Amino acid sequence: MNHSKKVLNVFSLVMINVIAVDSLRTLPISAKLGFSLVFYYIFAALTFFIPVALVAAELATAYPNTGGIYVWVREAFGRRAGFITIWLQWIYNVVWYPTMLAFIAATLSYLIAPHLGNNKFYLLGTALTLFWVFTFLNCFGMKLSSIVSIIGASIGTLLPMIVIIVLGAVWIFQDRPVAVNYPTTWLPDFSSLGNLSLFSAVLFGLIGMEMSAVHAEEVKNPQRDYPKALFYSALLIISTLSLGSLAIVIVVPNDSLSVVSGLVDAYAIFFNSYNMPWMTSVIAVLIILGGLSGVSAWIIGPTKGLLVSARDGSLPALFSRVNKYGSPVAILLTQGVIFTVLSTVFILLDSINAAYWVLSDLSAQMALLVYIMMFAAAIKLRYSKPEQPRGYTIPGGNLVMSLISGIGIICCIAAMIVGFIPPSQIPIKNVFLFECFLIGGLILFVFIPWLFAKKHDEQLCSEE
């Protein structure tokens, strides 16, 4: 191990984690939980967020190769399992894109005509336009630098996050009126499973720590500093997401809270009350710039793992090719077609909130499957490849690793189960269409990679 490359201190790793995980898009949907969101975030941190970070740190330092989860699962369970995992990681991002672009479109509407934020045709048209523009730019190798993306994430995510937390704190200290139709309890209502459905959205809002885990080996003293950085990261991320969501809770009535435009609605209420309505537009511009600076990376990023898998032979040869700009055009265009079809859910379902939730839920379901595979791989590799050098190792031996990974697996399965139940907080009139879209999408997107992987294995056997 080259110690000259160990350049990250605890603070650096904490900031990498915060930028990777913190998201404004999560705040409105978390706010739907009312004050009980604090319980959800603390519970999610203990049963999912921290286990993911610990397990990913060990795996990333044991297998620092490019490929991440794909490599980890492949080493544990073989190429077919690795391909299914990287496919799911790609497709859940594709399903997630419409929600993120709808969020940007709703924020953009505040600069044009605020009422458009509740117009499903405007959201659909804007999301499709933005996605295809950035897809074609990526096809020609036109990307923003990582520095620009980091700056955009900072001013477009962290700054607005801090602003809404400060506004919420000032509002409370000034004893201003608080929205009262939220549950006043800090504990969830366990009387109905529908009240727990949004837990999968809370978990989905906390994904991303495995991407920053690749930096664990660059920490000066991994065994000492990585757990310390993890503790501070978890504290900061859970605090910012909880407090940001609570700021929305105290000013936007639950019945009128949009999970798409709810964040900007909250800013508008705050700034209008302080006779600073122009500040809503300033914040909206920051959010849009931050979002757009990341769109290019979101579109091209997940295709890289799929390209590696395609070159392994797990997909038709067409998907393993790149153009003269180094862009996987076939994957990008396929991604665009799937995005376009999925985006029509904004028209098919009865409300924007319902459409936004079903896409978020389907994304979360597939993401949780990926994490189940990651946890299972961590346990398997401890027993099958104990001799593999690890820059960071979860202390306590195989028993503690199995316990931590087991808690993560149980948490993911529980969240998936309640995710199939329509949430009490988001009325869904056409429950049949909701269930068909969710179950059908899950079956389709899991069956396709299994089919490709099975066909590839059969070809290998026939060649041998």
UniProtKB/Swiss-Prot annotation:
InterPro entries: AA/rel_permease1, APC_superfamily
Key words of the record: Cell membrane, Membrane, Transmembrane, Transmembrane helix, Transport
The keyword Methyltransferase belongs to this UniProt entry's keyword annotation: no
Superkingdom to which the source organism belongs: Bacteria
Gene3D superfamilies in the cross-refs: Amino acid/polyamine transporter I (1.20.1740.10)
Compartment(s) of residence: Cell membrane
Disulfide links within the chain: none
GO molecular function: transmembrane transporter activity
One GO CC term on file: plasma membrane
Location (main, coarse): membrane
Annotated TM spans: 7-27, 37-57, 94-114, 121-141, 153-173, 196-216, 231-251, 282-302, 329-349, 359-379, 401-421, 432-452
Its membrane topology: Multi-pass membrane protein
Protein family (similarity comment): Belongs to the amino acid-polyamine-organocation (APC) superfamily.
Protein name: Uncharacterized transporter lpg1691
Species for this entry: Legionella pneumophila subsp. pneumophila (strain Philadelphia 1 / ATCC 33152 / DSM 7513)
